[in-house]
Amino acid sequence: MAKLTLEVEQYTQNLREKLQEAGYSYYVLDQPIMEDAVYDHLLRELQELESQYPQLIVSDSPTQRVGEKPATKFVSVKHNIPLYSLENAFNIQELKSWQERWQRQTLLENQRLTLPLRGEVKIKNSIDESDNFSTVNSLAPVITGSNFDEIDLASVDYICELKIDGSALALTYENGLLVRGATRGDGIMGEDITQNVKTINSIPLKLKVDNPPLLVEVRGEAFLSINVFENINAEREKIGEIIFANPRNAAAGTLRQLDSKIVAKRRLDFFAYTLYLEENESNFLQFYTQSQCLELLKKLGFKVNPNGQVCSSLNEVEAYYQYWDKQRENLPYLTDGVVVKLNSLSLQEKLGFTQKYPRWAIALKYPAEEIPTIVQGVTVQVGRTGAITPVAELKPVQLAGTTVQRASLHNSDRLAELDLHIGDTVIVRKAGEIIPEVVRVLPELRPKKAQRFQMPTHCPECSQPLIKPRNEAVTRCINTSCPAILRGSLAHWASRAALDINGLGEKLVQQLVNSGLVKSVADLYNLTMEDLTSLERMGKKSANKLIEAMGTSKAQPWRRVLYGLGIRHVGTVNAELLTQKFPTVAQLSQAKATDIETVHGIGPEIAQYVEQWFRVPANQNLVERLKIAGVTMETKDSTSGMAKLTETVLAIQNLAARQNLVARQNLENLVERLKIAGVTMETKDSTSDVVEVQSGLLRGKTFVLTGTLPTMRRDEAKNLIQNAGGKVTSSVSSKTDFIVVGEDGGSKLEKAKKLGVKELSESELLEALAVTGI
């Protein structure tokens, strides 16, 4: 074992603190302070140091989030305080009945109120003790003359919080360090899943406070964002595994995985909502209301849902509920209702619990998002990649405010699992509250003569045999001349994020394919005025505009062209990454998968798809024809001599990061001297001089980015905005024109709403960028 020096010990501690702060800023505050690549490099360095010097490993190190060995089983543990579920209310009248009950209970108690309203719960010092824990408030003085029947109960504050659709967790901290994470279980006994809990980046391994309390317990909800959930299901579907029914089931199943490495890959998130302290910590943290409790949780380093609101009346509660019933579809996670609590923790304590529920809280559920209907038939769709998707044709039904007539059945495996028959009664829901899908079949209601639906063996569009590739759940048509694949490819090529051909919509694409004028994307650039005007409802003016739009599309940058080619798994971000590494189509088309996967962010599977696509003769012919037509197939070379020197300097910096402390200092001194000499210390964005924006929607506008975007990193979005003439700032102010909102928008979004700043999704931003030509 290498000798541990004070210098190495101090350096390791500093490295650990930097990573902890960067993780907190990214996962909890949603305000990144460190580039992903830098974080990954520093984490790897910390792992190497801890491997070399095991005595430096501490329980709250970022390296300890994922365990090395899978667990063999989970141990049952008793909760320090029972983890009760909530009573449900399904409409406002039931909420009012709950209010009447707690008010009546309060009057019946006729006890003296303890003021000030203090929230303290006694917890015994050892989490292994099995005694019952009781809520007490022995430290606050009793004020005479202040009993329940003298209080204006109608003026008591409520606090409303979104009910996150996930799995409840109880987290125990001793001396500020996370020592246990447990599931709800039956409310009295749960399972110790500490190893899995540590993989959730929004759960602090160490409380962010000096001199922490001896014992702290935090309750909250572990959940999967909609985007992460959909990605997990897509991966499971691809390898032939059964997909999860909903994010809640996926979160629960993930938490009970014996291998924490699997848990880490699924990117669970966590919102904290309750804090319990030991009685003798009275001088440490003072809080008297649930709203103060939430603020304190944030100070301790926890992520708290930003949409909570204190309401002074049931009318305000109703308004809050109605607002989020309409707005929840815009959230990046699922919420199935609103949790309404009495804000006063002392009043909560006085009211106590029934055998099942707290008397001081209730879950006001949204209208049902699942509803039964009848399958009248099944049709099969063919996507642009040849994927065959069965779709249930339903008896029209109202669901989440819209009429649903069709629902996805995903693939043949899912269809077989459901054992679907025409005429079956099925339960339908909005997947991610957006796309309708069939959740389950009710076979007990099946008509006697109902026929099981059989997946076709031949493509419904071109009649060619269908195949199901190994290790995939999706059945495909592989006929490159299939009309459905061609229609999808043309629509994708013309989309705003690709070549942005204005006027080439779905109906016109259908006409071009049906008429035989277009049999390949390349045929678009051979269309004449005579060809177009021969189509129904296509006059000379419209035809001329379309020809102009197609001419303009030839100048779109190489990254857009690559995206437009429709290679599987090559979205806008991957296209950007690939074209930076391979600035010409010749370089990319000749690259092997092993070369392609060296691009940061491109895995071996995507690399294989890219290599295979360019090996298909029909695709090679398409690329050649597009080049002949004048479509851009390379990135303009913006690499000056100084920029090339910059690459050398960056290589030196990377080398420095791998050296010992003394050698690193020498190399860093060299880098500093090069800076003074005027050498640029950052890579020039290869897209910056592709288009000089003279005017447009974004020019001169101020943007703020918040949350995790679906397909882009925030630095990529920032570069695109700046290239279009916009300005990106880190904080929201009255001068902010737009806020681009990703998953878990946080406090920036909240402030933007108050200031009336216009919100943009990633797709809306890309549309605006497409208009500018970026």
From Swiss-Prot:
Binding site for Zn(2+): 459, 462, 477, 482
TM spans (from-to): none
InterPro entries registered for this protein in UniProt: BRCT_dom, BRCT_dom_sf, DisA/LigA_HHH, DNA_ligase, DNA_ligase_AS, DNA_ligase_CS, DNAligase_adenylation, DNAligase_N
Active-site feature positions: 163 (n6-amp-lysine intermediate)
GO molecular function: DNA binding; DNA ligase (NAD+) activity; metal ion binding
Record-listed E.C. numbers: 6.5.1.2
Enzyme class name: ligase
Cofactor: Mg(2+); Mn(2+)
BRCT domain span: 693-774
Source superkingdom: Bacteria
Record key words, sorted: DNA damage, DNA repair, DNA replication, Ligase, Magnesium, Manganese, Metal-binding, NAD, Zinc
Binding of NAD(+), residues: 36-40, 85-86, 161, 184, 221, 341, 365
Catalysed transformations (reactions): NAD(+) + (deoxyribonucleotide)n-3'-hydroxyl + 5'-phospho-(deoxyribonucleotide)m = (deoxyribonucleotide)n+m + AMP + beta-nicotinamide D-nucleotide
GO BP terms, alphabetized: DNA repair; DNA replication
PANTHER family linked: CHROMOSOME TRANSMISSION FIDELITY FACTOR 18 (PTHR23389), REPLICATION FACTOR C SUBUNIT 1 (PTHR23389:SF6)
Described purpose of this protein according to its UniProt entry: DNA ligase that catalyzes the formation of phosphodiester linkages between 5'-phosphoryl and 3'-hydroxyl groups in double-stranded DNA using NAD as a coenzyme and as the energy source for the reaction. It is essential for DNA replication and repair of damaged DNA.
Family recorded in the similarity comment: Belongs to the NAD-dependent DNA ligase family. LigA subfamily.
Protein name: DNA ligase
Species whose genome carries this gene: Trichodesmium erythraeum (strain IMS101)
Gene: ligA
